Swiss-Prot record:
GO terms for molecular function: DNA binding; RNA polymerase II-specific DNA-binding transcription factor binding; transcription coregulator activity. Has a role in transcriptional regulation. Acts in parallel with the Ras/MAPK and the PI3K/PKB pathways in the control of cell identity and cellular growth. Essential for regulation of the cytoskeleton and cell growth but not for cell proliferation or growth rate. Required specifically for the microtubule-based basal transport of lipid droplets. Plays a partially redundant function downstream of Raf in cell fate specification in the developing eye. Pair-rule protein that regulates embryonic cellularization, gastrulation and segmentation. It comes from Drosophila melanogaster. The gene is lilli. This is AF4/FMR2 family member lilli. Residues 577-586 have a biased composition (Gly residues). Component of the super elongation complex (SEC), at least composed of Ell, Cdk9, cyclin-T (CycT), lilli and ear. Residues 851-863 bind DNA.
Length: 1673
């Protein structure tokens, strides 16, 4: 080992020399500045440097890898091979000039930090890209020096600190040695920016979105917190997994070494400085750390010396072991031996072999953390931040430690070491990076920081933990930091920082709950060293925090995702999104609480990154992963993390100020309960702690990364239980936290098994926990609360109070587990009315009992109507669920629907921490909450607000209070609270919204949220909850649509209530599989729809999707049964919107139609609120259903929803027996299909009251309309022209590919319809026999008024067993939709609606007889291709690219298909040229294309002549058919282009032949020439046959005519050839299927139709070749 180490050191030094070349001078300066410590460190430098170099090798670029290869060669020569040489892809160094601002700032900021980092900080994840790598962590001690040389910019920035930490002489010597040895092999740094392309080099190890655990340096170097984040996470995980063991033997010193392989634990702040320096961005935080003093003396040298001595004594041996172990860890990480990036992100050291060693290190790290914890207690902000940062991410710890050092120089030695130990613990690679990035980006403005972090996290969450995104790293670090801080501060600083910490805790509630559970587990297991029990406890939390906190953080934040990796399920996803979420949450918590906190400003994360003054601690991005809610700490914004007991089951972190002490006591119980519940399979729905400074856009982005953002406890048991409970239990809540970036950081949706599964809507910050799906049968009924309340809360006055809502404790263990960080500072004000009104005690243990209702009991209640157990993870929502549910229900019934709406909005806005708006409160007076006074938490909405607030807090919570409770109102604007009042079907759609997060957990939470919203806003909703459950399926559909809307609306908290029942779960899972595809499109569409600036709330606007029917029902129908019936129709529209098959336009239209009324109807919110009536959605959906019902809407509708809602009425048309409850049609809100030719029927109610009245009218009319609709369905089936159905099909065919896919999914149904239809019928008169959408819509418009009621009736009659009729009745064109399922794709002539309807819906309505649909040629859709030349150029480029690819293709089939694709793209180009280019150019393009396709056809001939029994020949024959069709149409087009010329030629020739002009060449005609000549002429003429002389012009015309007519002849001839080949080759089924899906291809087809048709055919053929069993006939 000694030789190997030396070799490695030399090689690494060589590597270092190259990486140091850029950072050498800066690192030398740092070394010189820190010579005293460096001398002490020199002894340790060698080993540390070796470790650092070793870790760097994994972060190196090509030259570094070459060095590593050289080193490996040497090792092989010595018989030593490094297991991880494959994995050690060195993170590319960030090349920064010595004068680089980032480096300068980092060095200056980290001047003292460097000393500490060199001496103490091993866990500076940013210092070395490899820091995040388990293998790198052991080496991080040397990395202090190597960081100075680390290839990554982060390492270069932090490297100087590290180098200074190591003696400048030894560093130089090492550099010299390195240069001496590897110069031959080592490729010097080439100044190339880190390669971020595939995440290959800097982030290559991050195959599974693990940033740089493969040892790659952050791609962007210091500025890239993301890459650093991955490193940080890797380091954290490695430190915890690889470094912790060393840490245990080493004790605190090892702990310091562990994060970066250097002695980071003692110099926690310097280590963060290194991380920041490494990140390069964190230089400003360093500056803020020492703003006035360029070099503040590090903590007393005693500490430094002690650290150095400890490192020298302990680290000397440990580094070898760590180094020896590192190869394994990197290899495993890079190659995902056990799980994708499991080891990288998994802080569960025991689970990951590479992390096994770090596990030991982690314990010592925590021990060191404990020592700093005392100072942390002394300086709560710094201490909490430092331990959190350390525990969560080395980078954060380093940055934070530095900042606290600056602020508290005397305390900082301990705090720094404590922070440093957390740094090694930082298992959340991304967390660390997030925190750093936030520091980098938004240090100056907490709100700005949190928002930017949200966006960054979104990106990084999406990148799945890629190290390329620094914001993710930063936010993750922040979140991890916050979590660690919360954990550290939990006991000593709990009350001190309670307000500040509350916000962070609320943001990180889920994380804290998980962490606290782990803490409790680990509390029983005292940490290795460092004295105080609190410290021990914190260290335990942190040490486990690597394992558990990181797991928790991983579930809560991106960075911590790694911990989940060992747990296995969402390791990768958790990491990427988790850190982003964590970062946002962390920053949100910081901002929301105390934006400027001198201690926080001293943090390395933000102050260093932003060069901010030490006192100006802008909210560091505290991502749930970064901030350890368990450890009390101060978040970057000054928010204190008061560790609240992590209730795993509750998944809500107690964060109420009043109950903080009690919460601490309860935390353990809650943690235990959470563990039990998780183990028990209950999905805990800790709603993500509300983050104050969340950008709605960031929210959306985070929402997109729900899984990665999922907080998961590192404890594998908890993770397993959680994961098993909700396939993405953490994802729901943590994704909500991550979606709300800032708002939902703490919130974590712990998957509640079965009905309690937690859904995380991707676009919805709030995690939705489905409470018990007690009434699967009821789910058939359309719950009155089909309404989706999407309340994106824009900057409302002061909504942080809502954040105060206690996370609802399941089983009342954690009274405020989910207390939203948003209101941490003002929890009492937030809930003055809310807490007192709904339960009067959100922050009190009594609330906990109420929260029991929130917990599992709430699921029980859900059956009772308040099924949103998880919906409001916050304690307030649990309060609502408890007694408030019934209270709310009664008032709601009594209160007018407007009141219920107001409550919904109020409590939505409140939950989005916009609850400050008294308007909302007033709107929801009906609630138990006489204390409407918490304006944001109106009395009525107090419980509802708690629910909404808990869910919204997890979602909007962060967004509204993203920066700080007070500050975030502006930022809150992005928040949306989507309250889906229907319980049954929500999970399916919640899944759609949830995206990657587990739909069930999200759905359950949504359900809870919905229930809470209903309960809070109108407790009558709670009464309706049983109807919701009764109609869970239809509700589910609606929830999905609203969920989609909310997620698409960006900030929208799509809370889908999925309490339908076990049936719904099965259906939801089916929908989960189907819907996600179209969910993205839907989300995009809905985002556009709801962007306040763009007529919607694109991640910013407030959208309230409310089922007006539901509200009306609540107001009108005290009985839940009636409300359930009216809500069934809204559920159907929701299903339509949620249905993945639905085309984006349809979704957009649906969303738009709903959005208009929503906006109009929700004046209560200060910010824009789009109130979408689901009943309206139902109509639109019904219209779509008309087209799509038979074929399951071609996937546009919600066939999945229907299947899932089989018991319910298909397509969200719950068979509600209560017609009154169903939304009639809101007649005032008429769909204006003509306005939107597609499906976008815009319902424009005159006002909210009118809508309510309409709903009430629906209640009356629905029963009548039931019969009417049944008759209409029959009549329509008979009468409605196929054209209309075609129309729908054509509109659906607007997205032919989606429709094709959907139809393929429903191939059986489609085939049924096809079989029923004769071929001629299947091929209608022409391709374009699609009724114009306008015509259809106009027809629909007329019928919508009728069908609105009919739809309600249909929903009501769905229980009667005629869902298809209902669908038809509900749909403006019920018969066409039935028939149109197949035609919906395009021009399908015939379609059987009843079969599709029956197939789609569990309830089999009477199947109408098969009907043939005939479409008129004039009904075809008129396409208006764009004249944009850019698009034409795009087509041309696509064609050229495909042709070149085909030229190089060797496989005959692939070549032919590529050529044919190129041809159709050329056709699109030529078609576009017809409108913007000359006729000649267009003609040339077509001619060239024809020549190309003729050339292609030569490749088919060999196969066409052979037997078609061969699959290959069959496929070639089919391609030949498509080719012949294309040739025919191109020939016809060439003729049409010349038709005018041809006509003129024909006229001229006709005249010529009629007049008989032209001389006879050899006749008796006398010659005018002389006789002598005449004889000769005659003699010569006698040689020519007699004939007529044709003038040249006539000859030319004849030639042209021949050419033109040959085109025409070829067109028909080629077409006939294709037809013959179809018949002879027995390919009729293949063509028929294409015709059904894309409309028949005829000689009238446009080039766009040809393109669509051919592309569909080629795709089918490719699929057939890839999967022969599935190839079409």
């Amino acid at each position: 080992m000694a030789q190997q180490q030396q070799q490695q050191m030399q090689q690494q030094q060589q590597h270092h020399t190259s990486s140091i070349n850029n950072n050498n001078s800066s690192s030398i300066v740092l070394l010189q500045q820190q010579q005293p410590q460096q001398q002490q460190q020199q002894l340790d430098q060698l080993q540390q440097y070796n470790n650092n170099l070793y870790s760097q090798n994994y972060n190196m670029e090509e030259y570094e890898r070459r060095k590593r290869r050289e080193r490996e060669k040497i090792e092989r020569q010595q018989g030593i091979q490094i297991d991880d040489r494959e994995t050690s892809l060195f993170g590319e160094p960030r090349r920064l000039t010595e004068g680089d601002a980032e480096i300068t700032a980092a060095l200056g900021e980290f001047f003292e930090a460097r000393e500490y980092i060199n001496n103490q900080t091993v866990g500076i994840s940013r210092s070395a890209p490899g820091a995040g790598n388990p293998r790198l962590q052991p080496n991080l001690a040397p990395q202090a020096k190597s960081l100075g040389h680390s290839p990554s910019s982060a390492s270069s920035a932090a490297g100087p600190t590290a180098a200074s930490a190591t003696t400048s002489l030894p560093g130089q010597q090492q550099h010299y040695q390195q240069q001496q040895r590897p110069p031959t092999y080592v490729k010097q740094a080439d100044n190339k920016p880190p390669y971020n392309g595939r995440g290959g080099y800097p982030g290559q190890p991050m195959k599974n979105d693990i940033p740089s655990s493969s040892g790659m340096a952050p791609p962007r170097g210091p500025p890239r917190t993301s890459s650093s984040n991955s490193n940080s996470s890797s380091v954290t995980n490695n430190a915890s997994s690889g470094g912790v063991p060393a840490s245990t033997p080493l004790g605190p010193p090892l702990s310091t070494q562990m994060p970066n392989g250097r002695e980071k634990s003692f110099l926690g702040p310097p280590a963060p400085a290194l991380h920041n320096g490494t990140g390069g961005r964190f230089v400003p935080p360093a500056a803020s750390k020492r703003p006035g003093v360029g070099q503040q003396p590090p903590p007393p040298e005693k500490d430094v010396n002690k650290i150095i001595s400890d490192i020298a004594n302990i680290f000397t041996v440990q580094p070898l072991t760590l180094i020896a172990a590192t190869p394994h860890a990197p290899t495993r990480e890079n190659y995902n031996l056990l799980a994708p990036n499991r080891q990288k992100y998994a802080m569960d050291i025991p689970s990951s072999p590479p992390s096994a060693e770090p596990s030991s290190l982690m314990t010592p790290l925590f021990a060191p953390i404990t020592s700093p914890i005392a100072p942390l207690v002394t300086t709560p902000p710094q201490a909490s931040q430092m331990p959190l940062g350390g525990a969560t991410s080395g980078t954060i710890l380093a940055g934070e430690a530095l900042a606290p050092l600056h602020q508290l120089p005397p305390t900082m030695p301990k705090a720094a070491s404590g922070v440093t130990s957390p740094g090694p613990v930082k298992p959340l690679k991304t967390e660390k990076n997030h925190s750093l990035e936030k520091q980098d980006s938004c240090l100056e403005n907490d709100l700005e920081l949190s928002e930017s972090e949200d966006e960054q996290r979104k990106k990084e969450g999406r990148s799945g933990g890629n190290s390329s995104n620094s914001s993710e790293s930063d936010s993750s670090e922040s979140g991890s930091e916050s979590s660690s801080k919360n954990d550290l501060q939990h006991h000593p600083n709990h009350q001190q920082h309670h307000h500040q910490l509350q916000q962070q805790q609320q943001q990180q509630q889920a994380t804290m709950q998980q962490q606290q559970v782990l803490q409790q587990q680990h509390r029983s297991q005292p940490l290795t060293s460092n004295g105080a029990q609190n410290k021990k406890f914190r260290h335990e939390i942190i040490a486990r925090g690597s394992n558990t906190i990181t797991g928790l953080l991983s579930s809560s934040g991106f960075g911590s995702g790694g911990n989940v990796g060992p747990a296995g399920v969402n390791s990768n996803a958790v990491v990427g999104t988790g850190s982003g979420s964590g970062g946002t949450l962390s920053s949100g918590g910081s901002s929301s609480n105390k934006t400027p906190s001198p201690t926080e400003s001293n943090k390395w994360n933000l102050s260093r990154f932003f060069h901010k003054p030490a006192n100006q601690t802008n909210s560091e991005s505290v991502s749930p992963g970064n901030v350890s809610m368990k450890v009390p700490g101060i978040l970057p914004g000054g928010a204190q993390i008061i560790p609240e007991s992590i209730d795993v089951t509750t998944a809500i972190v107690k964060n109420e100020k009043n109950d903080m002490a009690m919460e601490e006591g309860e935390e353990e119980d809650d943690d235990e309960e959470q563990q039990l519940r998780y183990g028990g399979g209950l999905s805990v729905t800790p709603v993500a702690v509300k983050k104050e400074a969340i950008d709605a856009v960031s929210e959306m982005a985070l929402g997109a990364i729900p899984k990665t953002q999922i907080k998961r406890e590192s404890a594998e048991t908890l993770l397993s239980a959680r994961l098993s409970d909700s396939g993405t239990s953490a994802s729901g809540s943590s994704s909500s936290s991550s979606s709300s970036s800032d708002s939902a950081m703490g919130g974590e949706v712990v998957p509640m098994p079965g009905p309690g599964e937690t859904l995380q809507l991707p676009g919805v910050p709030a995690a939705i926990t489905t409470v018990m799906r007690v009434q699967p049968t009821q789910s058939q009924k359309a719950p009155p609360s089909n309404s989706v309340t999407l309340t994106p809360i824009l900057p409302l006055p002061t909504s942080p109070k809502q954040r105060q809502k206690k996370p609802r404790k399941k089983k009342a263990i954690t009274s405020a587990p989910i207390l939203d960080s948003s209101d941490d500072d003002e929890p009492p004000p937030k809930h003055p009315g809310l807490d007192h009104t709904a339960v009067s005690v959100q922050t009190q243990p009594a609330t906990d009992t109420v929260k029991k209702g929130r917990g599992r009991p709430r699921k029980q209640q859900q059956s009772g109507g308040s099924g949103n157990l998880s919906s409001a993870s916050a304690g307030s929502s649990s309060q609502t669920k408890g007694p408030t549910l019934t209270a709310a229900k009664k008032p709601l019934a009594k209160t007018p629907l407007a009141m219920s709406r107001a409550r919904k909005r109020e409590h939505s806005s409140q939950s989005s921490s916009n609850g400050n708006t008294p308007t909302k409160k007033v709107a929801t007076p009906q609630l138990v909450a006489a204390p409407l006074k918490p304006t944001s938490n109106t009395a009525g909405s107090s419980s509802s607000d708690e629910d909404s607030s808990s869910s919204a807090e997890s979602s909007s919570k962060s967004s509204s209070s993203s920066s700080s409770s007070d500050d975030t109102e502006t930022q809150n604007t992005n928040c949306r609270i989507v309250k889906l009042n229907k319980t049954g079907a929500v999970q399916k759609k919640a899944l759609l919204g949830s995206g990657s997060s587990s739909p069930s957990s999200s759905g359950s939470e949504a359900e809870d949220q919905t229930t809470r919203s209903q309960v809070g806003s109108g407790q009558a909703l709670a009464q309706q909850l049983p109807p919701y459950k009764q109609l869970p399926i239809s509700q589910h559909s609606q929830h999905l649509s609203s969920s989609d809307c909310s997620s698409s609306s960006g900030g929208c908290t799509a809370v889908c209530s999925s309490s339908s029942g076990e049936e719904d779960e099965g259906r939801r899972e089916k929908e989960r599989e189907r819907k996600p595809k179209s969910d993205k499109n839907k989300i995009n569409t809905l985002t556009r729809i709801f962007n306040p600036k763009e007529g919607g709330a694109k991640k910013q606007g407030q959208v309230v999707i409310v089922d007006l029917q539901e509200e009306q029902q609540q107001g009108k129908l005290d009985a839940a049964a009636q409300p359930s019936a009216p809500q069934a129709p809204p559920a159907a529209p929701a299903a339509i919107m949620a249905k993945p098959r639905m085309t984006p336009t349809q979704q957009q239209q649906l969303g738009a139609g709903l959005a208009s009324p929503a906006r109009t109807t929700t004046p209560h919110l200060t910010s824009l609120i789009c109130k979408i009536d689901l009943s309206k959605l139902s109509r639109e959906r019904i219209m779509r259903l008309k087209k799509l019902t038979p074929a399951q809407q071609n996937g546009h509708l919600t066939p999945k929803d229907q299947a899932t809602n089989a018991v319910h009425v298909p397509n969200g048309y719950a068979g509600d027996t209560n017609p009154a409850a169903k939304v009639k049609h809101e007649h005032p809100v008429k769909p204006e299909p003509e306005l939107d030719a597609g499906y976008e029927a815009k319902f424009k109610p005159g006002n909210v009251k009118q809508e309510f009245q309409l709903k009430q009218e629906r209640d009356r009319d629905r029963e009548r309309e039931r019969e009417r609709e049944r008759e209409r369905e029959r009549d329509r089936e008979r009468e409605q022209p196929p054209g209309r159905r075609r129309k729908r099909s054509s509109s659906s065919s607007s997205s032919p590919y989606k429709e094709k896919k959907r139809k393929k999914e429903k191939a059986d149904q489609l085939q049924m319809g096809k079989e029923l239809l004769p071929v001629p019928v299947l091929l209608p008169s022409n391709n374009h026999e699609r009724m114009p959408n306008h015509d259809r819509l106009s027809y629909d418009k007329l019928q919508l008024l009728h069908e609105d009621a009919a739809a309600v009736i249909g929903d009501v009659s769905a229980p009667n067993g005629s869902p298809t009729k209902k669908l038809l009745a509900m749909s403006p064109l019920p018969p066409p939709p039935t028939v149109t399922v197949a035609p919906a794709t395009c021009n399908e002539a015939v379609q059987t609606t009843p079969p599709s309807a029956t197939a789609t819906s569990a309830i089999a309505p009477p199947v109408p007889a098969t009907r043939l649909i005939y479409r008129s040629y004039f009904d075809r859709d008129v396409e208006h291709p764009s004249d944009d030349p850019r698009k034409n150029n795009q087509f041309l480029q696509e064609a050229i690219n495909r042709k070149h690819a085909a030229d190089l293709e060797r496989d005959s089939f692939n070549q032919v298909t590529l050529y044919l694709e190129a041809v159709v793209y050329f056709l699109l180009t030529a078609d576009a040229m017809e409108r913007c280019s000359s006729e000649q150019a267009t003609n040339t393009m077509y001619k060239d294309t024809l020549s190309l396709i003729k050339f292609i056809s030569t490749k088919f001939r060999p196969y066409q002549q052979q037997s078609t029994t061969n699959i290959q020949h069959e496929t070639h024959n089919k391609v030949a058919i498509l080719s012949l069709r294309c040739q025919s149409l191109i020939s016809l087009k060439l003729y049409k282009l010349r038709r005018k010329d041809c006509r003129a030629i024909i006229n001229s020739l006709t005249d010529f032949f009629r007049v008989g002009r032209g001389d006879i060449a050899n006749g008796n005609t006398p010659s005018s020439i002389s006789p002598s000549n005449s004889v000769g002429s005659q003699g010569s003429g006698s040689n020519t046959p007699p004939g007529r002389i044709v003038p040249p012009d006539i000859h030319n015309m004849l030639c042209k005519q021949n050419e033109f007519l040959s085109y025409l002849n070829s067109a028909h001839e080629l077409w006939d050839q294709a037809d013959r080949l179809v018949r002879t080759g027995n390919h009729i089924d293949f063509i028929r299927e294409l015709d059904h899906e894309n409309g028949p291809l005829t000689l009238h087809s446009t080039m766009h139709e040809v393109f669509r048709y051919v592309q569909a055919g080629l795709k089918t053929l490719r699929d057939a070749v890839s999967h022969p069993t599935h190839q079409s006939q």
